[in-house]
């Protein structure tokens, strides 16, 4: 069995179109494949690149400022640092492709699109670092709570249903921390077939060791 770790990540962006709008902020945490404990984390702002447009409504939505963005790194340095970080946490296997990280996020295909655009600018691709499949907590939420069709369920909605604290929604690292807790909640259900409030609260204490995260199953 390949022991690939999980990467939970999130991009804040200058709009909704990966071909027109850039990444403005990126954050990720690495989780141990078995215990789901956090191994490492990294976050950064990214300077504007490739003449892509940063829309005002996107800044208003994410609460990221131009001052934050201009304090960030170039896209070249972002890609180099990100790929080095991802590579550090690749599982050690004879077949390097099998050791790639398992990507986790809320509506993660959205983030993948923006990340791949940035990597392609540097003659690279996310396929070199992440497994072909991914785990989308948005889809897990829709399946768990019977939400059909094209209706979306936000990270805020999912966290509210599971009593997970989410502060400063749309701040990249805050979203990542909440998504990681949401992922742990789903994994608890998958691994045990149940997730009572007491069991999940105990699981988070064991995994995180941080009391300020509220985490219990919705009634």
Predicted regions and their residues:
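Conserved non-catalytic scaffold segment of RNase H-like nuclease domains
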Residues: 2-116, 157-164, 170, 212-216
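Acidic two-metal-ion nuclease catalytic site recognized across multiple nuclease folds
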Residues: 161, 177-219
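Acidic donor-binding loop at a coil-to-helix junction in glycosyltransferase catalytic cores
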Residues: 174
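Short coil/loop linkers at secondary-structure junctions
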Residues: 64-65, 125-126, 147-148, 165-167
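Short alpha-helix plus adjacent loop in nuclease-associated cores
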Residues: 134-149
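A structural motif
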Residues: 148-160
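Substrate-recognition/cap helix-loop segment adjacent to the acidic, metal-dependent catalytic center
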Residues: 111-133
